[in-house]
């Protein structure tokens, strides 16, 4: 699947319902007040940015449940997760993670650079996800001509532990529901797309 990994959904930025999740981090009421103000100001700045003719959609998640917030956004596939704590605020920076990269791959970036580069970052993510999907498709597509070749390809070599053929087969079809039912019964193969 091209829009998911072991951690959850991976949404291309152009189709994501929201683009950025801001997660303020604080330990006291005093920190909360200043970090929340910084976070809300950053959210307003980001919402003024246009991404492919629509304003950026920004979520502020101020739940006080630590790492659960981050994993919630990873599973939901939000393109960019941003953590903001007192140190980030003092340095006028943010701690950013991209959903197209491993979840531990996070970087500190200045607030101004982040706001200025967010459309570029999202476009780079869009391109990376498309190229990854295209490479998967090309690397997992086999062309099959003829019924015998089709059955040979999908018949398990070892019926005790049948191999999984994940991917795509470009094959001819006789346009008969009976033919499709027979292939499904014999090989557990189903038609996904008919041009």
Name what the model sees in each region.
Residues 1-195:
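NTP/phosphate- and nucleic-acid-binding module
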């Amino acid at each position: 699947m091209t829009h998911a990994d072991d951690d959850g959904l991976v949404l291309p930025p152009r189709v994501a319902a929201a683009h950025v999740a801001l997660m303020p981090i604080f330990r006291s009421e005093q920190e909360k007040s200043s970090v929340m103000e910084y976070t809300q100001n950053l959210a307003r700045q980001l919402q003024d940015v246009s991404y492919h003719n629509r304003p950026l959609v920004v979520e502020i998640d101020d739940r006080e449940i630590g790492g659960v917030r981050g994993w919630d956004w990873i599973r939901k596939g939000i393109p960019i997760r941003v953590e903001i704590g007192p140190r980030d605020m003092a340095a006028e920076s943010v701690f950013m993670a991209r959903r197209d990269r491993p979840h531990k791959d996070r970087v500190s970036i200045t607030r101004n650079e982040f706001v200025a580069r967010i459309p570029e970052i999202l476009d780079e993510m869009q391109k990376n996800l498309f190229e990854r999907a295209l490479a998967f498709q090309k690397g997992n597509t086999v062309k099959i001509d003829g019924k015998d070749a089709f059955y040979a390809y999908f018949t398990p070599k070892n019926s005790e532990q049948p191999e999984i053929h994940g991917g795509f087969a470009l094959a001819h079809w006789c346009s008969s529901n009976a033919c499709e039912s027979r292939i499904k019964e014999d090989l557990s193969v189903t038609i996904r797309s008919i041009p």
